[in-house]
Amino acid sequence: MLHYRKGEIKEYVFRDLPKLLPGDALMVYNDTKVVPARLLFQRESGAHIEVFCLEPLSPSDYNISFASRESCSWKCVIGNAKKWKGDVLHLYNPDADENIARMGLEAVLLGRDGQSGEVLFRWKDGSAFSEVLERGGRIPIPPYLNRES
């Protein structure tokens, strides 16, 4: 860790942080997690469609949408969007165990605007949508990192 004071830069380790901060400093702890919101689906033809969940639409509250147990719709970025002709897509996960297959996650395109659209997700096993994403989704990794999640 580098610390700049009065025109001088010094190197420290993290445990030195308390002595470097002013007495009235406010520390904020960030315990957020990245949601595995990248889902890979497959058409009957075999074409793969990637759906990246951006924000919930129905229900529109994140907590309520993540707690949904049968269906919810989200605004999504759709990879390979031109190949999705409006048919029902089924989750594709070559590494899936039978629990992922049993949940029966499907995606229905309700509307599209270029590379994004409204997608209705339906599943059969009664799990919360947050659990569906944890089991079937992937962590979104920026393309410039040149690696998979």
Regions found by a protein language model. Name each.
Residues G23-A25, G86-D87:
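Loop/turn positions that initiate beta-strands
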Residues M27-Y29:
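Short hydrophobic beta-strand that contains or immediately precedes a catalytic carboxylate
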Residues M1-L2:
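Terminal targeting/leader modules
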Residues R5-P18, T32-V35, L39-S149:
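Internal, non-catalytic "lid/hinge" segments that mediate substrate recognition, gating
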